[in-house]
């Protein structure tokens, strides 16, 4: 047993113990992080009604764009960080993490500026109707100021987990989310601020989470940072982007699909008994429900990522196989539990996000049951897609991400909407989910056969 293995439990500790220690805090952190927008939408829905829900749905692509870039930087940097540690390249690990911090701040400032300069054209592009635009402008115009801090919260969190401090990363997000949960009702109802109150509550909470995460920099256990590490190294940016490309494509593709969905719901909803605003509002509510599922599965993946990256880098291939086997079993169990809840209580879940008329609830239940129908296999698709960048195969992961969102879901949505109107949109999701599952599982089985089942000595 070499010195590195003695120092790093990722190479020697039981896989089940490691996954439990790493994944549970990551799941909690992700679910809590998802609550930033969900709590806003719940309180806005209760205070303003379903038009408020529609407004946050229209503004949500801004959040998913930030998540796409933040996760690309964070997951890409964390993957490279663990691969470097597995190869005993501590200096490179430091430089990658330092570059990631500078990149997150820079990207956050750029996105904030673009949103503030082009707010209304962006919201119109995202599918806003005349009734929704005013609410959405109020919300997004304020939350734009929190974007740099949100980027840090999203992107630096995986690096803290990569250092083995999953609990700290979880607590940093929980602090912000709990603060948001307290400030939301205080600002919306107590100070009678409405949607602007929810927006300011989100910004303040994001600032606090970012500060807590940045305070961890001098506490890293696996490396000791130097001031010179915190600069933009374009060679490191390239590596970070390549390993984080799958996460970026997954999120940005979801953003494109969401924008297309909003516009299709606006167009074909207007031709139905529901009108445009109800389908857009319901689409936002159901997507927020689905975000909880995504948060759980991505948390599992993020918990496994350091284990996979370190052991693949150290050529301990048997541990890679063992980790993936356990990860997929846990994913299927959790996905099935959530699927049962989603399908059994769609009305109650819709009602959590505010009141509406009979047509609103009718469309909400139909849409939720169909959209979430294949939740029990969606988890496996996500885990398989994000496995490949964790072991350095970024291109394959990127291709699989693109396949689900851009090559399957988007064409199916357009085809069914033009053929069957808003009813066609309801069934586009489950059809695409099943096709994507078959593709991803086939590729995964083929690729896993190429990874040795025995370890190699790392010289």
Please identify what each model-predicted range represents.
Residues 1-23, 81-148, 190-245, 308-373, ...:
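Short alpha-helical transmembrane segments in multi-pass integral membrane proteins
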Residues 21-40, 142, 176, 205-209, ...:
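Transmembrane helical elements of multi-pass membrane transporters/channels
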Residues 35-53, 123-130, 186-193, 255-285, ...:
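Helix-terminus/linker motif at the lipid-water interface of multi-pass membrane proteins
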Residues 50-61, 136, 140, 199, ...:
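Small-residue hotspots at the loop-to-helix junctions and early N-terminal turns
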Residues 65, 180-184, 210-214, 292, ...:
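Hydrophobic transmembrane alpha-helices of multi-pass small-molecule transporters
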Residues 74, 143-161, 169-177, 198-213, ...:
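Short runs within selected transmembrane alpha-helices of multi-pass transporters and secretion channels
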């Amino acid at each position: 047993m070499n010195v590195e293995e003695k120092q790093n439990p990722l190479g020697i500790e039981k896989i089940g113990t490691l996954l439990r220690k790493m994944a549970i805090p990551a799941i909690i952190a992700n679910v809590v992080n998802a609550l930033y927008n969900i709590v806003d939408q719940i309180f806005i829905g209760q205070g303003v009604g379903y038009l408020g829900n529609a407004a946050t749905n229209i503004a949500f692509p801004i959040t998913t764009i930030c998540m796409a870039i933040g996760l690309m930087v964070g997951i890409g940097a964390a993957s490279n960080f663990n691969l470097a540690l597995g190869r005993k390249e501590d200096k490179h690990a430091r430089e990658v993490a330092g570059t990631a911090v500078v990149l997150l701040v820079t990207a956050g400032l750029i996105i904030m500026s673009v949103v503030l300069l082009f707010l209304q054209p962006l919201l119109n592009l995202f599918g806003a109707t005349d009734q929704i635009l005013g609410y959405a402008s109020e919300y997004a115009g304020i939350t734009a100021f929190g974007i740099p801090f949100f980027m840090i919260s999203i992107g630096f969190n995986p690096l803290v987990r990569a250092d083995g401090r999953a609990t700290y990363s979880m607590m940093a997000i929980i602090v912000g989310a709990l603060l948001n949960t307290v400030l939301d009702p205080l600002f919306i109802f107590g100070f009678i601020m409405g949607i602007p109150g929810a927006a300011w509550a989100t910004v303040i909470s994001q600032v606090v989470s970012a500060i807590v995460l940045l305070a961890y920099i001098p506490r890293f256990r696996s490396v000791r940072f130097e001031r010179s590490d915190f600069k933009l190294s374009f060679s490191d940016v390239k590596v970070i982007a390549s390993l984080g490309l799958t996460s970026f494509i997954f999120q940005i593709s979801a953003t494109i699909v969401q924008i297309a969905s909003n516009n299709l719901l606006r167009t074909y909803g207007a031709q139905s008994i529901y009108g445009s605003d109800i389908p857009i509002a319901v689409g936002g509510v159901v997507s927020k429900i689905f975000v909880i599922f995504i948060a759980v599965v991505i948390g599992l993946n993020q918990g496994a990522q350091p284990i996979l990256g370190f052991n693949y880098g150290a050529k301990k291939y048997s541990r890679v196989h063992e980790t993936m086997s356990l990860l997929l079993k846990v994913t299927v169990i959790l996905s099935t539990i959530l699927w049962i809840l989603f399908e059994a209580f769609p009305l109650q879940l819709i009602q959590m996000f505010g009141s509406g008329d009979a047509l609103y609830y009718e469309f909400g239940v139909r849409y939720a049951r169909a959209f979430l129908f294949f939740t029990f296999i969606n988890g496996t698709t996500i885990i398989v897609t994000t496995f490949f960048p964790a072991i350095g195969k970024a291109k394959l992961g990127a291709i699989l991400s693109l396949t689900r969102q851009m090559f399957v879901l988007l064409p199916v949505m357009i085809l069914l909407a033009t053929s069957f109107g808003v009813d066609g949109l309801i069934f586009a999701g489950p059809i695409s989910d099943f096709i994507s599952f078959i593709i991803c599982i086939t590729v995964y089985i083929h690729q896993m056969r190429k990874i040795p089942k025995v370890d190699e000595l790392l010289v």
